[in-house]
Amino acid sequence: MSWLSSLYPIFIASTAFCALGLLLVAIILLSRKFLIKVHPCKLRINNDDSLTKTVDSGKTLLSSLLDSGIAIPSPCGGKAACKQCKIRITKNVDEPLETDRSTFSKQQLEQGWRLSCQTKVQHDMNLEIEERYFNASSWEGTVVSNENVATFIKELVLSVDPARPIPFKPGGYLQITVPSYKTNTSDWKQTMDPQYYSDWETFHLFDKVIDHQSLDANSANKAYSLASYPAELPLIKFNIRIATPPFINKSPDPTIPWGVCSSYIFSLKPGDKVTVSGPYGESFMKEDNRPVIFLIGGAGSSFGRSHILDLLLSKHTNRELTLWYGARSLKENIYQEEYEKLEKEFPNFHYHLVLSQPLQEDLDKGWDSKDPIKTNFLFKAFELGQLSKLPNPEDYLYYVCGPALHNSSILTLLDNYGVERSSIILDDFGS
C-alpha cells in the first residue's frame, strides 16, 4: 500500500491543477460575456442612407455584411489567402493589419482599403462597395447526391428551384454557407464507394469527431468552383476536396482541426438542405477565338468541366480545345468516361490524362509507366507532349486550376516559353 500512498500527493496536485485550469477558462468566458459588450454599429454604404445597415459589433466586416444580405466574395473562406474580399472604408478607418499591408500598396492603405475578412466591426463606418455585389443572392439547394469521385474528393450535386435559376457563367463560383454542425467521419462511408475505404483506414481517418456546434450564423463560408454548366440547371455540381489535418506517422495531427467547410460538405447526405450565395467569378471564357488549353489537376476538375461542356455542348464552338488532366492514379481520375466520349464526338477536342503515381492495378490494365507523356508530373508531360511543339505558344489561351504546386509549376513553365500573363486564366482560391 506504500506505493499508493506515494501517488496520493501527485493525484491531489493533478486534480488541483485541472481544477485551476477549468476555473481560469470559466473566468475568461465570463469576462468576455460581461466585459466585451456588444453594441449596434451603422455601416453606411456608398453614401446612400437607404443602404445603411445596422449590425452588432465584434464580427468581421465580411460576416456582418453577409448577415445584412451583401455577400462579398471570399473564396478562401475568410483566411486572408485569396485577397478577394477587398473593401474601401472611407470613414473611421482602423490601422491596417499585417494582412492588409501585404495586400495593398501604401497609397491604397491610406485610401482606406482593407480585407473585410480581417476587419472587425467596432464602431460606425462608411464603406464603398461595388454595385455588382448587391446583385448576389442566396439560394437553398437540396442534396441530390454526394459521392466520392476520388479518394479525397466528392462530387456534390444540388438541386435548386427551377423557377429561380442561378445566373452563373462557366468558370464562376458560389459560396457555401456552413451552419453549426457535428459529424463523425465514419458516417461519411454512407456516401463513399468502398474502393476508397482502404486509404482512409491507412491514414486513420475514420471515427474522428468534428464538432463545430459553436459556429455563429454566417461566420463560415467558402467558395467552390462550379463543375456544372448552365444547361444542367436546376442541378449544380461541385468537386470538393476534404481538408484533413497534416499527417504524423500516417495519422491526422490531433492538434490541427479539419477544414470547417469541407468537413461539413463531406457530411452531407441526399435530402439535406444547403445554402449557397453568389454567383461570383472572374475566370470566365475569353471570346476571342484563340485555341484553349486547359491544364487541370485534382479538384480543379470543376473549373475545367464547366468550361469544356459549355463550349462544346451549348456554344458548339469550333475553337481547338485541349485538356491535360493530372491525377495520381486511375482511381483518382475524374470524368474520364465523359471526356473520352466528348473526344470521339468532337474532332476539335483533345483529352490527355497524365498519372504521377500509377498503381500496380493501373499497370495491369495496360497503363504505360515508361511513356513520359502518360506517366509524369502534368507540367512536364504537357511540355513534352504539346508546349515544346507549338510554333507560337503565346497565341493560345491557358486555363489553369489545381493544387498550389501544380499552379506554380504551370505558371513558371508558361513564363519560360514567353506566354504573357494576360493569356493565362488562373482559378486559384488562395491554395
Swiss-Prot record:
It is found in: Cell inner membrane. Residues 41-133 form the 2Fe-2S ferredoxin-type domain. Its cofactor is [2Fe-2S] cluster; FAD. One of its GO terms (cellular component) is plasma membrane. It is an enzyme of class 7 (translocase). It catalyses: a ubiquinone + n Na(+)(in) + NADH + H(+) = a ubiquinol + n Na(+)(out) + NAD(+). HAMAP family: NqrF. NQR complex catalyzes the reduction of ubiquinone-1 to ubiquinol by two successive reactions, coupled with the transport of Na(+) ions from the cytoplasm to the periplasm. The first step is catalyzed by NqrF, which accepts electrons from NADH and reduces ubiquinone-1 to ubisemiquinone by a one-electron transfer pathway. Belongs to the NqrF family. This is Na(+)-translocating NADH-quinone reductase subunit F. It comes from Chlamydia muridarum (strain MoPn / Nigg).
